[in-house]
Amino acid sequence: MNVNEAIAYIHSVFWKGSIPGLSRTQELLAKMGNPEKKLKFVHIAGTNGKGSTAAMTASILQQAGYTVGLYTSPYIYRFHERMQVNGVQISDEELVEVTEFVKPFADSMTESPTEFELVCGIAFEYFLRKNCDIVVLEVGMGGAFDATNVIECPEVAVITNIGLDHTDFLGNTLEEIAATKAGIFKEGGNAVVYRGTAGVEQVFETVCAEKHICLRKADFDGLRLISHGLEGQVFDCGARKQLQLPLLGVHQLKNAAVVLGIMDTLIEKGWNITEEHIREGLRLTSWPGRFDIVGRDPLFIIDGGHNPQCIEALVANIQDYLTGRKVIALTGVLADKDYGDMYKPVMPLVQEFVCITPPNPRKLEAAELAAHLTAVGAKATACQSIEEGVRTAISLAGNDGVVLCFGSLYTIGSIKEALDEQ
């Protein structure tokens, strides 16, 4: 098996889609010898901000001298991003080796695992082989019935910002979604949560009381933005002053406040993390695809925003960082997203939309998106390919303008590839 064959095998169960439930993952891991039981975790659920929160957490723990696994999804540019140890992605050789180990166990199951469940098995085995001291584990979707929730009580269970997404699986209200995500809270454990609505916080408080969990809410009241620009931002959070963060946007400060809560909890549990580790870890955090500057001439920004809360953050970033600039949106979206509402807040800030078709079975055709945007009063054009979209957007932006890509995580890798080939 070579790396392409390994990835093809992993993707071969893609047709199963998402099937909530833990039984398949538990069966697979039991056959493998339960690697997850020999690892420690920071387990992170939430609608938005999971990846950024995970990246900051892993960066700080790495600065503290620990061997840190990081498991995230989906990937932006290449599959290997989903499994990293101390910032280094799994190698081709390691991916082949671990996939070959897991394959016979998966193949022997009566009900084969989904792709996500298979990748979880591969990741747990990989992190064990790399002797990780701790793994920062991002939930795929939801919480209670997500494949990652097979783990025993983590060092900290974390819930980031909650919004209405995947309502067909998770619930129709914020409170229902919060309850599903709180399924990662284990009896007698520790939890850190993003401050939400009164109803959402009540859900967390109730679950934590029932399960004797020590609950910590992120300190948003202590947040103060000192300065910000396209290179990053400087902020205070409570007693911690002049912290530097390269991730852009006020919403990232709230994610950082969650991370500081995680660190305070880990310190209380005996992990050796100093204030300098925290400061350096935040300063060195890297997380691609989130208001991410990937080109300078013209300014070319990629953002994975694809639901109303992400778009709210994107609008704030355009207003904070791009005021007075000509903004050309390069965008594609999945057909099952509420794209009507998604584009509405961005329209007044964008001079023209260049529409592309995402490379995904759930895609909305570029022509259909352009027709919708034109019908609601925007200037929009459809392109036949992502390459044509990149060329068109750059041409429209000119030297002084900005190309802003958003709408779907699934377009980012192809856009970056096309940009690199310009």
State what each model feature region is.
Residues M1-K40, D168:
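Positively charged, low-complexity intrinsically disordered leader regions
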Residues L22, Q26-A30, N34-K37, Q63-E152, ...:
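ATP-dependent carboxylate-amine ligase catalytic core
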Residues K37-K38, I134-L137, F145-V158, I162-H166, ...:
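Nucleotide phosphate-binding/pyrophosphate-handling subdomain across enzymes
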Residues I44, S52-G69:
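A conserved segment at the C-terminal end of the G1
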Residues V119-F169, E201-Q242:
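Extended acidic/charged loop-beta regions that coordinate divalent cations
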Residues Y194-R195, V207-G229, P246-V250, I278-L284, ...:
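Beta-strand->loop->alpha-helix junctions that form or flank phosphate-binding loops
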Residues T197-R216, E231, L299-F300, P308, ...:
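C-terminal helical cap/extension that packs against the catalytic core
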